[in-house]
Amino acid sequence: MGAGVGVAGCTRGHRNWVPSQLPPREIKAGVSLAVVTEFAWVLAPRPKRATASALGTESPRFLDRPDFFDYPDSDQARLLAVAQFIGEKPIVFINSGSSPGLFHHILVGLLVVAFFFLLFQFCTHINFQKGA
């Protein structure tokens, strides 16, 4: 074994490096990762602390209701109240009276035509010869 090499074929740049040991820069990264992980666990909220902090504070009554912001779009009074609350001008959609039937028929017709076109392309380009 040559001088300056701790393990045969080791070219990690460290004189006495052993494969089971981390190089010094990787040790620093591992230690800092362990410190950050431990620090994160210290800062994570615990159920005891969460319930203790929740006891002293009260949320507004309307936030606890199960139907908070759960209302149909047809309820214009609530829509206007929410728009006023968030400071926006409300948008009111009106029914124009035209039915979506024509557009629906055109769309379905185009899809059927596209399907038959792809089927035609497949059938004309497939080769039914044996062994081909």
From Swiss-Prot:
Record's keyword annotation contains Cytoplasm: no
Membrane-crossing segments per the record: 100-120
The species this protein was found in: Homo sapiens
Tissue: Testis-specific.
InterPro entries: FIMP
UniProt name for this protein: Fertilization-influencing membrane protein
Gene Ontology, cellular component aspect: plasma membrane
Keywords, comma-separated and alphabetical: Cell membrane, Fertilization, Membrane, Transmembrane, Transmembrane helix
Gene Ontology terms describing biological process: fertilization; fusion of sperm to egg plasma membrane involved in single fertilization
Pfam families: FIMP
Bilayer topology annotation: Single-pass type I membrane protein
Origin organism lineage: Eukaryota, Metazoa, Chordata, Craniata, Vertebrata
Subcellular location: Cell membrane
Biological role: May play a role in sperm-oocyte fusion during fertilization.
